[in-house]
Amino acid sequence: MTETLTIRRPDDWHVHLRDRDVLRGVVPYTARQFARAIVMPNLSPPMTDVAGVAAYRDRILAALPQGSAFTPLMTLYLTDSTDIEEVARGFAEGVFVAAKLYPAHATTGSAHGVTDIRNIYPVLEKMQEIGMPLLIHGEVTDSHVDIFDREAVFIERTLTRLVADMPALRIVFEHITTEEAAQFVEGAGDSIAATITPQHLHINRNAMLVGGIRPHAFCLPVAKREKHRLALRKLATSGFSRVFLGTDTAPHAKHLKEAACGCAGIFNAPFALESYVTVFDEEGALDRFEAFASLNGPAFYRMPVNEDRIVLERAPIEVPEVIDCNGTAIVPFHAGETLGWRIAAA
């Protein structure tokens, strides 16, 4: 039985770092484990131009622990009125590495998102031309579509057509949650990749609803039936090269989760690697963990892999019920549980 696992330092290809006091409280957890992270732009107001994204990057760098080598990889928030030249300039100058498509009202901070993907086709055509990745929250938002079906309907109605119209556009189908999404990505061409969160590998929708409403298991896209969780585990641990680590860590204050209308999002950053490696251990795929965590993402984003290493060891670690993040109480994923792996050297 493997007792230690040494891998290249991973990257997290989907994080929410928030801003101000909460940013300062949560960013150390990501920076401790990961060399780089794709930072979501859905602040209030959202990061819709070069100047705003650059200023946010500066705030993240200022919030890092002293001596940290962590690099935030920034993204642009797309709207119906996004300027094509602003997109091209920010990408060329290295201010952001990708653009994020939120269908309007699909999730937290998406009110300014795109109302119809055809509205931004000229922007997407420019992105295809310059090789800029598009990151997609893949759900429809029609009120008549069941929340558990929104990802599958998005594939059928929007994503399939987009890929046909722009076959060279580099797309990351983020935080996939369904068997349909796993099959779509596996069957697509080399321009399509996906991220998978730790929660969607560990829990199904029962975690939210059995024995009472469990707000800390609520995120968007919501966890689905057990067959979907199993399909995601199969894909993540298969060695498939176009799927990679993206936590979608989404911190919210405890009292905002435990409310009549609680926020969507799971704060998984503090024990992200421990959570992921547990899945690979359970699936007998520890030999494939480095590819998922450290190699596949850089390959898709056309970035070098990290040279330094991180060591994980088989040893119990207790996850606290609550974490004080610079004055904000936040409940982490796996709260109150004991995980079987921990970071030995980072």
Curated annotation (Swiss-Prot):
Enzyme Commission code(s) on record: 3.5.2.3
Molecular-function GO terms, alphabetical: dihydroorotase activity; zinc ion binding
Broadest EC class assigned to this enzyme: hydrolase
Residues the entry annotates as binding substrate: 16-18, 42, 137, 220, 252, 264
SUPFAM superfamilies: Metallo-dependent hydrolases
Pathway of action: Pyrimidine metabolism; UMP biosynthesis via de novo pathway; (S)-dihydroorotate from bicarbonate: step 3/3
Ligand binding (Zn(2+) 1): 14, 16, 100, 248
Keywords, ordered alphabetically: Hydrolase, Metal-binding, Pyrimidine biosynthesis, Zinc
An example Gene Ontology CC term for this record: cytosol
UniProt modified residues of type N6-carboxylysine: 100
Binding site for Zn(2+) 2: 100, 137, 175
Any one GO biological process: 'de novo' UMP biosynthetic process
Catalytic activity: (S)-dihydroorotate + H2O = N-carbamoyl-L-aspartate + H(+)
Purpose of the protein: Catalyzes the reversible cyclization of carbamoyl aspartate to dihydroorotate.
Subunit structure: Homodimer.
Family: Belongs to the metallo-dependent hydrolases superfamily. DHOase family. Class II DHOase subfamily.
Name of this protein: Dihydroorotase
Organism: Novosphingobium aromaticivorans (strain ATCC 700278 / DSM 12444 / CCUG 56034 / CIP 105152 / NBRC 16084 / F199)
Annotated gene: pyrC
